[in-house]
C-alpha cells in the first residue's frame, strides 16, 4: 500500500472557481447535464459542483461499475474466485463496445479476472453477459440495495440471469466512487485490483477526461465512461500526486448534440476533455485519505 497524502495547510478555496469553469464549458457544449463533483481534501466528500444530481438517467456503460460492485462483493465474501472460469460461447457475444466480438472463433475459457478487466478497461459488453453467469441481475440489484443505493439498478431479464444495464444518478455514482476510492466499498485487495484496471490507459478510453494529459497525469485518473444514443457520461476518481484520492467526478449528460458521433469530436466529449484538464490544474493540494495506487508505477507500465 502506498503512503497517503497529507493535507497542505492554507489550501485556497477553489470550488467556486471550478464551478464557474464547469458552467462555462458545459454551456458551450450543449446538452442537458447532471453532475456532481466532490473534493476529498478534507477526508470527506465536499461538493464543489452540483447540477441536477438526482436526475435518474440511463447509465450506459457507467453501470458496469454497479456490476463490478456486486461481483467483487461476492469475491470478498468468498462465493466467487477471480480464477473461476466460463466459456466464451458464440451466442453470448454482444455488439457494441469491447474486443471479444472481433474474434474469428470462440470457445475460450475466460477467468472472472479476465472478464472484470475487459468490462472495465475496454467496456466489453460481452463480458457483462458472461459475468451474469456469476452474478445475476437480481443479485446486482440486491447488492446495490444493501449498500443503500436506491436509484442505481440494472434491469433483469425475466427468467434469465442476464440483464440490461439500467439507470443511476450522478449523486449515487459519486457516492459509489467515493466508497471505492476510500476503501470502504470493497476489501483492500479488491479495491487495488479494480483501481489498477481503471487507471490503466495504454489500452482503454482516453477521448474524454484524460485526453489532454501526459502519461503521468493520466495515471492519476481512474475513469469509466458511457455512451448510448444521446447520452455521454464520464465519471471517475482523480488522485493527488502521491496517489491518494482527491476528487470524485460524475459527469452525466443527455440530449447531447451530434448524437451519432461517438468519437472525440462530439461536443460533450470535448467538454469532458476540457473539464479533466481543468480539474487537474485547479486541484493541486494533497489528500489525507489512504492511497491504493502508485501513479508513477502505473505511468511506467507497472502495478
Regions found by a protein language model. Give the residues of each.
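Active-site-proximal beta-strand/loop segments in catalytic clefts of secreted hydrolases
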Residues: 38-41, 90-91, 119-123, 134, ...
Amino acid at each position: 500500500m502506498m503512503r497517503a497524502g497529507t493535507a497542505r495547510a492554507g489550501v485556497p478555496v477553489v470550488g467556486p472557481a471550478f464551478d464557474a469553469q464547469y458552467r462555462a464549458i458545459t454551456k458551450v457544449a450543449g446538452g442537458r447535464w447532471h453532475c456532481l463533483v466532490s473534493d476529498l481534501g478534507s477526508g470527506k466528500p465536499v461538493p464543489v459542483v452540483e447540477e441536477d444530481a438526482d436526475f435518474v438517467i440511463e447509465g450506459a456503460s457507467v453501470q458496469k461499475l454497479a456490476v463490478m460492485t456486486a461481483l467483487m462483493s461476492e469475491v470478498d465474501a468468498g462465493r466467487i474466485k477471480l480464477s473461476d472460469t466460463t466459456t466464451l460461447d458464440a451466442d453470448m457475444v454482444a455488439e457494441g463496445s469491447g474486443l471479444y466480438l472481433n474474434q474469428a472463433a470462440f470457445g475460450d475459457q475466460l477467468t472472472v479476472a479476465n472478464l472484470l478487466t475487459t468490462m472495465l478497461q475496454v467496456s466489453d459488453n460481452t463480458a457483462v453477459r458472461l459475468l451474469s453467469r456469476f452474478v445475476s441481475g437480481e443479485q446486482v440489484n440486491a447488492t446495490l440495495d444493501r449498500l443503500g443505493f436506491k436509484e442505481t439498478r440494472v434491469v433483469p431479464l425475466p427468467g434469465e440471469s442476464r440483464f440490461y444495464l439500467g439507470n443511476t444518478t450522478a449523486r449515487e455514482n459519486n457516492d459509489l466512487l467515493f466508497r471505492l476510492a476510500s476503501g470502504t466499498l470493497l476489501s483492500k485487495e479488491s479495491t487495488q485490483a479494480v483501481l489498477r484496471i481503471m487507471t490503466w490507459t495504454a489500452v482503454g478510453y482516453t477521448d474524454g477526461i484524460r485526453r489532454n494529459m501526459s502519461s503521468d497525469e493520466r495515471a492519476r485518473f481512474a475513469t469509466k465512461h458511457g455512451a448510448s444514443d444521446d447520452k455521454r457520461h464520464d465519471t471517475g476518481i482523480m488522485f493527488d500526486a502521491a496517489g491518494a484520492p482527491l476528487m470524485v467526478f460524475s459527469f452525466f449528460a443527455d440530449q447531447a448534440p451530434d448524437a451519432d458521433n461517438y468519437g472525440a469530436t462530439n461536443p460533450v466529449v470535448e467538454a469532458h476533455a476540457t473539464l479533466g484538464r481543468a480539474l487537474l490544474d485547479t486541484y493541486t493540494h494533497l489528500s489525507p485519505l489512504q492511497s491504493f495506487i502508485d501513479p508513477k508505477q502505473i505511468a511506467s507500465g507497472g502495478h
